[in-house]
Design a protein with these regions (language model features):
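Active-site-adjacent structural elements that line small-molecule/cofactor binding pockets in enzymes
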Residues: 1-293
């Protein structure tokens, strides 16, 4: 029997099922904390597209799927919890203004006493980029520069920066976080893996514990070694689904990921039939129990 005790369990905020009542969101966050869950994940989509459009719309989410804005929701959750950590999974960084995200993330880090991590991705939905007035086709290249700019803003009181996509003319944000905000990257494109190895504090795979995931990890380890960066302390967050699972499947999945060096396992409890806050908490508890037995 492998020891799954060291694997930190995170929970995915049930974005489309929690509703809009702040007392329900508070009860959920406090319930997750009471279960001893290490982190809460919040997904990010700013706009939902109307599928009734020329050429149709292919994508997992449309205008009828609710997404709570992660940074403002985490600021609220920070105020009603004490230990629960938080990670955006993943914020679509290139469709947002870099300096503003740096400012907001710093604020959440301060309000939560450094319980916040920024998970970032590049997204896939052109409708959101258009609505947010950001360029879609250079989003990967911009993301790398965005992270560099944010780290400068978090650390320095005056920046004179000219990049390919950013110009900061002797300015910075205030207040700044008292500790570095960890940045984790989601995705598996080769350029993204290079970026994660070079700039990331962790990786968020969007796949199963398979050969492709192992190849991604090997690639990042090699890249970090080349750059003289340690792989110790580099986090890996995979995700399990409550829906369609049972104790055996969850344990098998967790062990497969643990064998690959995964540090954090997040469980998503939505899309498993209608339920309420208590129901979501019971699902998390059931998943936890399966891994502890």
């Amino acid at each position: 029997q492998m020891d799954l005790q060291n694997m930190q369990i995170r929970a995915a905020f049930p974005h489309n099922e929690i509703g809009t009542d702040p007392s329900a969101i508070k009860a959920y966050a406090q319930g997750v904390e009471a279960l001893g869950i290490s982190h809460l994940l919040i997904y990010d989509h700013v706009l939902g597209a109307d599928p009734d459009r020329e050429g149709g719309f292919r994508g997992p989410y449309d205008k009828d799927v609710a997404f709570h804005e992660p940074l403002t929701t985490f600021a609220f959750i920070a105020g009603v919890t004490e230990k629960l950590e938080m990670i955006t999974t993943v914020m679509i960084l290139p469709q947002r203004q870099t300096v503003l995200v740096a400012k907001q993330a710093a604020q959440v880090a301060l309000l939560s006493n450094n319980r916040f991590r920024l998970g970032v991705g590049v997204g896939w939905n052109q409708v959101e980029y258009t609505g947010l007035n950001e360029t879609f086709n250079n989003r990967g290249r911009r993301q790398a520069e965005q992270v560099e700019v944010m780290r400068k803003l978090w650390n320095e009181d005056s920046i004179d920066y000219t990049g390919e996509y950013h110009r900061i003319d002797k300015a910075s944000i205030n207040p700044r976080p008292s500790k570095p905000i960890p940045v984790w990257f989601g995705g598996s494109a080769p350029a993204l893996l290079d970026r994660t190895a070079r700039l990331g504090d962790g990786w968020i795979p969007l796949m199963g514990a398979n050969e492709k995931a192992q190849a991604c990890l090997d690639h990042m380890k090699a890249k970090r070694e080349e750059a003289g960066l340690s792989f110790d302390g580099f986090g890996i967050q995979s995700q399990a689904q409550y829906a369609g699972g049972d104790a055996d499947r969850w344990v098998k999945h967790a062990k497969a990921w643990q064998n690959m060096g995964c540090t954090h396992l997040a469980v998503a409890t939505h899309n498993a039939g209608e339920t309420n806050v208590d129901g979501h908490l019971k699902r998390i508890e059931e998943y936890q129990r399966a891994l502890q037995e």
